[in-house]
């Protein structure tokens, strides 16, 4: 028995007691467990946190926990690093959750980046973290200003507060961080001047303040930071000149000052930056003067040069100097380039991105440029002429080609089928002839823009497995049937202003991702009901104006639940308007940014730099829509035009009463029912069209008075009611009172009102109910008059008889 007891004691001391001894300090373990409990309490279903913090158990050594690092060389085994990167899933938590871990004063590194922490940074809790060397709080929702307590962390070498919503200013106390090597404050709301005290941070290697609200000038003290390798101040409001002594920063590899308000010239000292690899000065409209090529061509390590959007700068290479660098990216868009495409590009064999658009370049597309292994070529908005070299499309490296708005001519080469392009824009040139059938063999073509040329014939059929998402062939001379064969992912089909004819194809119902279909100004026939039945509910914009469609609009129109723009004007439609028009979901509620934006289509192509912005710049017509607005055809050109909601059924033969259900379309901005045969009253429900800006009901047979409810239309700035049979007083409201052009009410039965300076008489101002009441009253008065007359006559007769009888007796 005693042996068993001794054995039990031995096992207890061997196995159980060691489990109670921990390497990390007890108070630090408790702080970590408190943080874990707060996190689990605040975030439900936090599978990431539950899994990764599963090792954080009360009866275990915190030095063995995931995301925790202890000082193995110290006897106390204190926690020195916490890596909480991407721990918290979607769902905001308060910054107070950090308080427990900020009590661990032995921390050297703390990373809470890419979480969903909101609120002010708890500055007071950082006071005791005097050993902290690296602090990463990037990519959260911290707000308020940078707490001054952070500037007391004098051992700090890396401070990253980027991608939050921090405001306020950057204090001059930043000078206290003498050991700081990286200061990263990108994408916040920090404003004011960059403090001159920043020049005291002599150990600084990286200074990135991109996308804030800094103003004033770049402090000259920056030139004292001779160890700097990266300066990124782009997308602020910085003004004045680039410091002349910027050339002192001889270790600089990246200088990015783009998208500010800088002025003056590019300082000559820039040629001293022999280690410079990236120079970005684009979109500073105040920069002026010449760009001496000799300064830049001596920068042997330069790989990225972006000067676009500085239309006051003039490129000068009069010395015909050839560069010593090998660029990978070059953008001189809108830099005053003239003459032929520069010859010095011949030796830029490493070039993958070239943008020389919006200049005054002339001549032909050089064969040597087609031979370079460039991925992205943008030469739009120049004066280039001639035909395209066939070898241009035989380079497997070419992914992006934009030649829009030049004077290129001739036929599109048959070799186009050998290309690997994803984005091809040849719009607004003088290309003619037919489109080669080989174009359908381009394996990964995503966007094709051939609009505004003189192309003719039938458009080729794409294969069902095509990746084509965006097609614009509008404003050409194509004929034959409407193209019907595209890949299943097609979302944009812009085919207006051609000579397409015949009925609408059956297989459009396979385009389940179709968002915009524009076929206006063609010769398409058939019934509108058949056409609408072919469309997916994903369609947001449907423009079929000026075709030969017939029949009535079907009740099934309401199945197009995403529809925001419907233009069926200038066709041969007849019949009544279906009440289901009032059930178009996206015209009832305010529209939001949709898949019509660039991002969903091209965000995955990371090998094409800035493709979203480039497409946005080069494909302006994609964002335009011609509508009948303000009594004429007008172009809605707006990056946000997809926020418009529009219903245009004008110039048809529609008849009957206007359904009151149209008043449900509360987000409608443009409503045009003009030039039809509508009759009856203007619906009172039109007063509920609270967002409407343009209302055209002219050239119909509408009767009655203008509803007083229209006085509620506070956004209305265009109204046309002429050529109807309306009468009575024009309702008064601040908005309607401004619409005082008599022409918008012309040719009606008897409209009056102060807006058109026509006085209203009592008989003109009675509402229908009042008129009925007046008629009933007159009828009652008439009956009363005849009854009174009859009673009077009867009484008179009786009196006469009595009098005569009495007179006889008297005799």
UniProtKB/Swiss-Prot annotation:
It is a single-pass type I membrane protein. Pfam families: LRR_1 (PF00560), LRR_14 (PF23598), LRR_4 (PF12799), LRR_8 (PF13855), LRRNT_2 (PF08263). Glycans are attached at residues 46, 71, 128, 143, 215, 251, 347, 376, 407, 430, 499, 510, 546, 559, 583, 672, 701, 747. It comes from the Eukaryota. It is found in: Cell membrane. SMART domains: LRR_SD22, LRR_TYP. GO terms for cellular component: plasma membrane. Residues 22-782 are extracellular. Residues 1-21 form the signal peptide. LRR repeats lie at residues 104-128, 129-153, 155-177, 178-201, 203-225, 226-249, 251-273, 275-298, 299-322, 324-348, 349-369, 370-395, 397-419, 421-442, 443-466, 468-488, 490-510, 511-534, 536-560, 561-583, 643-665, 666-688, 690-713, 714-738. This is Receptor-like protein 46. It comes from Arabidopsis thaliana. The gene is RLP46.
């Amino acid at each position: 028995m005693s042996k068993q007891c001794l054995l039990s004691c031995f096992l207890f001391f061997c196995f159980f007691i060691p489990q109670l001894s921990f390497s990390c300090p007890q108070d630090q373990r408790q702080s970590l467990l408190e943080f874990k409990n707060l996190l689990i309490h605040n975030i439900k279903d936090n599978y990431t946190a539950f899994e990764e913090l599963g090792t954080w158990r009360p009866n275990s050594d915190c030095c063995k926990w995931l995301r925790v690092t202890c000082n193995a060389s110290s006897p106390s085994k204190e926690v020195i690093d916490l890596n909480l990167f991407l721990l918290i899933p979607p769902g905001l938590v308060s910054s107070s959750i950090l308080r427990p871990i900020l009590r661990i004063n032995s921390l050297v590194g703390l990373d809470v980046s890419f979480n969903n922490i909101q609120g002010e940074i708890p500055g007071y809790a950082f006071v005791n973290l005097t050993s902290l060397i690296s602090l990463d709080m990037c990519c959260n929702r911290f707000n308020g200003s940078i707490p001054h307590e952070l500037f007391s962390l004098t051992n700090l070498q890396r401070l990253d507060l980027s991608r939050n919503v921090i405001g306020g200013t950057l204090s001059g106390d930043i000078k206290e961080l003498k050991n700081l090597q990286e200061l990263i404050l990108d994408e916040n709301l920090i404003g004011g001047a960059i403090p001159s005290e920043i020049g005291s941070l002599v150990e600084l290697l990286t200074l990135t303040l991109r996308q804030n609200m800094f103003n004033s000038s770049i402090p000259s003290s920056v030139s004292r930071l001779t160890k700097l390798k990266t300066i990124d101040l782009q997308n602020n409001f910085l003004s004045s000149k680039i410091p002349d002594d910027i050339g002192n920063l001889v270790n600089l590899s990246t200088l990015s000052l783009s998208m500010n308000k800088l002025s003056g010239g590019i300082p000559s000292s820039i040629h001293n930056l022999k280690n410079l690899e990236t120079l970005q000065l684009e979109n500073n409209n105040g920069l002026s003067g010449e760009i001496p090529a000799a300064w830049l061509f001596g920068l042997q390590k330069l790989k990225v040069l972006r000067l676009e959007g500085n239309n006051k700068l003039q490129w000068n290479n009069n010395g015909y100097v050839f560069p010593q660098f090998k660029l990978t990216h070059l953008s001189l868009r809108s830099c005053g380039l003239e003459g032929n495409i520069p010859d010095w590009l011949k030796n830029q064999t490493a070039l993958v991105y070239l943008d020389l658009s919006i200049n005054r370049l002339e001549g032909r597309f050089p064969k040597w440029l087609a031979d370079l292994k460039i991925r992205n070529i943008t030469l739009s908005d120049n004066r280039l002429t001639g035909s395209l070299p066939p070898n241009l499309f035989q380079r497997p490296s070419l992914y992006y080609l934009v030649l829009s708005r030049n004077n290129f001519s001739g036929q599109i080469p048959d070799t186009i089928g050998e290309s690997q392009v994803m984005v091809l824009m040849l719009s607004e040139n003088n290309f003619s002839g037919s489109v080669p059938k080989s174009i359908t063999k381009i394996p990964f073509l995503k966007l094709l823009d051939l609009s505004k040329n003189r192309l003719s014939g039938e458009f080729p059929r794409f294969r069902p497995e095509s990746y084509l998402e965006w097609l614009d062939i509008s404003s050409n001379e194509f004929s034959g049937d409407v193209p019907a064969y595209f890949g299943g992912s097609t979302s944009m089909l812009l085919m207006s202003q051609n000579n397409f004819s015949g009925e609408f194809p059956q297989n459009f119902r396979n385009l389940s991702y179709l968002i915009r279909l524009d076929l206006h100004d063609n010769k398409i026939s058939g019934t509108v009901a058949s056409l609408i039945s072919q469309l997916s509910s994903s369609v947001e914009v449907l423009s079929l104006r000026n075709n030969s469609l017939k029949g009535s609009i079907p009740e099934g129109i309401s199945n197009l639940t995403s529809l925001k723009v419907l233009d069926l004007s200038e066709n041969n439609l007849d019949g009544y308007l279906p009440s289901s028009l009032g059930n178009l979901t996206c015209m009832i509620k305010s529209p939001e940014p949709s898949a019509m934006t660039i991002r969903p289509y091209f965000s995955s192509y990371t090998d094409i730099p800035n493709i979203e912005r480039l497409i946005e710049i080069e494909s302006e017509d994609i964002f335009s829509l011609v509508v009948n607005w303000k009594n004429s055809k007008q172009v809605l050109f707006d990056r946000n035009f997809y926020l418009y909601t529009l219903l245009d059924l004008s110039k048809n033969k529609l008849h009957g009463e206007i359904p009151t259900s149209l008043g449900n379309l509360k987000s409608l901005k443009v409503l045009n029912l003009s030039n039809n045969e509508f009759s009856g009253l203007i619906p009172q429900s039109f007063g509920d069209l609270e967002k409407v800006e343009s209302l055209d009901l002219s050239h119909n047979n509408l009767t009655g008075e203008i509803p007083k409810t229209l006085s509620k239309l506070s956004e209305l700035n265009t109204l046309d009611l002429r050529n109807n049979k309306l009468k009575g007083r024009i309702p008064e409201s601040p908005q309607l009172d401004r619409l005082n052009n008599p022409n918008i009410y012309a040719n009606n039965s008897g409209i009056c009102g102060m807006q058109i300076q026509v006085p209203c008489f009592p008989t003109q101002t009675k509402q229908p109910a009042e008129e009925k009441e007046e008629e009933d009253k007159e009828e009652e008065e008439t009956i009363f008059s005849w009854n009174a007359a009859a009673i009077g006559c009867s009484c008179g007769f009786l009196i006469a008889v009595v009098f005569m009888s009495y007179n006889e007796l008297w005799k």
